[in-house]
């Protein structure tokens, strides 16, 4: 955006300083991705830039790792698991998180702040501690090493995001609308689905996106709670880097 002709020297300094700062932040966020992408075209089975790649020699580049991704059963199964587990975890997170947010928005609920702090604690507690706790709890109830165990574990991580986004949407909600619906004979469920849900839908969708991304990217909890049969894509990526140092 161009500066107006009447901008003072101080305003010009601030403007260009601001643009420089934004550029540095953008570079800091994008540079790791820019570095990783060329490595996926490495012709060698090493997670490093070869002399041929640095010299831009075509012999140093290959699509072999992409072929491996789509043909190797380990990668295809991990991708399938992620595409199954993440939507299911998102559905559970959205259902429970939305109900919790709507319930906590009621004025007559006691200890709302305490309950809210407990519900969003998975965002605060270190992930390794949450994962260890889930491992012992799910082992005791027979869910460790099962698909539903991983789904519920990821749902626990996603619920706080749904609660926060839906609660933020409910701040501007007009309570007189629910009272008007009730006065016209609508029950609580009908009032929720016909009046309240359409108005808070942006918050629900935002929370669902956060919950899906959290589940799809998560690796620590699934290592504790899951087994080889529930190996997700991030887990397979972690294994490939740790054991094989593979660019795939």
List PLM regions with ranges:
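Membrane-helix interface segments
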Residues: 74, 106-115, 143-147, 188, ...
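Membrane-interfacial helix termini and adjacent extracytoplasmic/periplasmic loops
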Residues: 4-8, 50-58, 63, 111-112, ...
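Interhelical loop and adjacent transmembrane-helix boundary motif
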Residues: 6-15, 44, 60-74, 216-248
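Cytoplasmic-entry segments and transmembrane alpha-helices of multi-pass inner-membrane transporters
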Residues: 14-22, 96-133, 178, 202
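Transmembrane alpha-helix signature in integral membrane proteins
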Residues: 71-104
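A structural signal for multi-pass alpha-helical bundles of membrane permease subunits
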Residues: 31-46, 81, 130-141, 154, ...
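N-terminal signal-anchor/first transmembrane alpha helix
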Residues: 1-39
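Transmembrane alpha-helices
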Residues: 20-21, 30-33, 163-167, 173-175, ...
